[in-house]
Amino acid sequence: MRYKITIEYNGSNFIGWQRQKHLSNSIQEILEEAIFKFSRESVTTYVAGRTDAGVHALGQVAHFDLTADFDAYVVRNAINYHLIPHSISVLNVEKTDDEFHARFSAKKRHYLYKIINRYSPLTIDYNRAWLVRNPLDVEKMMRAVEYIKGNHDFSSFRARHCQSKSPVKTMDDLKIIHSDQCIDIYFSAISFLHNQVRIIVGTLVECGKNSFPPEYTKDILEAKDRSYAGMTAPPYGLYFVKVDY
């Protein structure tokens, strides 16, 4: 029986989603151990988006197979019991057919990056948003966003060790919602390059600091060179929001 699970986690204390050979405390490892404790079956979980260390999730989706046929609510409650005290929560469980794949069946992925623009240190949002102390011109950031939407070669916005075969991606939607000191940047696409969202955010922040005009964003894209773009924004402001199937 295949189970589709929707999970939420605070990524602050984890090394990321994926199991790593010589490191422990990945979300995948802890989740699979929790599944084993209630089912007595060793499983491999497959996920919609492999988040890096420090990145959070509001609606991550994964799937796994068990020989036993449990009610969905039993699976949810049992996994959550064995996840205590980790900051991971199973929000929903659905039984699905064997054709469903958390990664390959995805039609669109949605991310959020949270910035707090003020001078004072963060307390409530510590490790859950990027504190940017320099005043940001959000209007300029919004204008820069328009150059990034659509289909482009995003070589300037990919990590140097990115393993994706092609740097060409389509940014279906990219918008900024600004309220007082909070700047929320929403991204939607079928898939993303490694660190693409965080490098775009770092570049938008540089634009907001008046390091360059919004129009220069087009030049950054056309350069197809990582050195032209801004810094890679820290992981703790990034959230995997949801995935469409």
Swiss-Prot record:
Recorded hits in Gene3D superfamilies, A to Z, give: Pseudouridine synthase I, catalytic domain, C-terminal subdomain (3.30.70.660), Pseudouridine synthase I, catalytic domain, N-terminal subdomain (3.30.70.580)
- Look up keyword Protein transport and say if it applies: no
> What would be one Pfam family of this protein?
PseudoU_synth_1
Example GO BP: tRNA pseudouridine synthesis
What this chain does, per the entry, is described as:
Formation of pseudouridine at positions 38, 39 and 40 in the anticodon stem and loop of transfer RNAs.
Family statement drawn from the similarity comment of this UniProt entry: Belongs to the tRNA pseudouridine synthase TruA family.
For this entry, the protein name equals tRNA pseudouridine synthase A
User: Which source organism does the UniProt entry give?
Assistant: Ehrlichia canis (strain Jake)
